[in-house]
């Protein structure tokens, strides 16, 4: 996945804590074991610092996963790592919710806080 696709813009309120939630209900990837498509919802929830994510670039970034054979856990943590690199947010949580396969659903959540790094 090309994290270079992610673009940002200046946060107009960097002195204020506020939460941005972005939901993509049409995320697709491929199961690396079966080659079958996986369908899920990706939710990003973050408190920005100096910059915010530009949504069109995020859309194209997500499309990079469409034909990739990758496990749910890897998707969630890859998105988290790439978003941290692009945004340097105060906090960030990535939640991926996957449609049922064989009657089983899965939800993966990964979080980051800049306060933990201080």
UniProtKB/Swiss-Prot annotation:
Q: What is an annotated GO biological process for this record, any one?
A: tRNA modification
* Broad class of where this protein is predominantly found: cytoplasm
GO molecular function ontology, one term from the record? preQ1 synthase activity
Quote the subcellular location field of this record: Cytoplasm
Which GO cellular component terms, listed alphabetically, does the Swiss-Prot or TrEMBL entry include? cytoplasm
Uppermost EC category? oxidoreductase
| A Pfam entry, by short name | QueF
Keyword NADP carried by entry: yes
Pathway of this protein? tRNA modification; tRNA-queuosine biosynthesis
Q: What is its EC number?
A: 1.7.1.13
Mind listing the UniProt keywords for this protein, alphabetically? Cytoplasm, NADP, Oxidoreductase, Queuosine biosynthesis
Catalyses: 7-aminomethyl-7-carbaguanine + 2 NADP(+) = 7-cyano-7-deazaguanine + 2 NADPH + 3 H(+)
Active-site residues, as the UniProt record annotates them: 31, 38
Kindly indicate whether the keyword Cytoplasm belongs to this entry. Answer: yes
Annotated substrate binding lies at 53-55, 72-73
Against HAMAP family, the record matches this protein to: QueF_type1
Q: Which family is this sequence assigned to?
A: Belongs to the GTP cyclohydrolase I family. QueF type 1 subfamily.
Free-text function comment from the UniProt entry: Catalyzes the NADPH-dependent reduction of 7-cyano-7-deazaguanine (preQ0) to 7-aminomethyl-7-deazaguanine (preQ1).
- This protein is called NADPH-dependent 7-cyano-7-deazaguanine reductase
Q: Which gene encodes it?
A: queF
């Amino acid at each position: 996945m090309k994290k270079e696709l992610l673009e940002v813009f200046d946060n107009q309120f960097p002195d204020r804590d506020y939460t941005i939630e972005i939901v993509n209900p049409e995320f697709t990837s491929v199961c690396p074991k079966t080659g079958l498509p996986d369908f899920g919802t990706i939710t990003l929830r973050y408190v920005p610092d100096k910059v915010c994510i530009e949504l069109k670039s995020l859309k194209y970034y997500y499309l990079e996963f469409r034909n990739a054979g990758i496990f749910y856990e890897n998707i969630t943590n890859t998105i988290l790592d790439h978003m941290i690199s692009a945004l340097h947010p105060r906090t960030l949580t990535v939640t991926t919710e996957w449609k049922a396969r064989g009657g089983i659903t899965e939800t993966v959540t990964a979080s980051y806080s800049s306060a933990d790094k201080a």
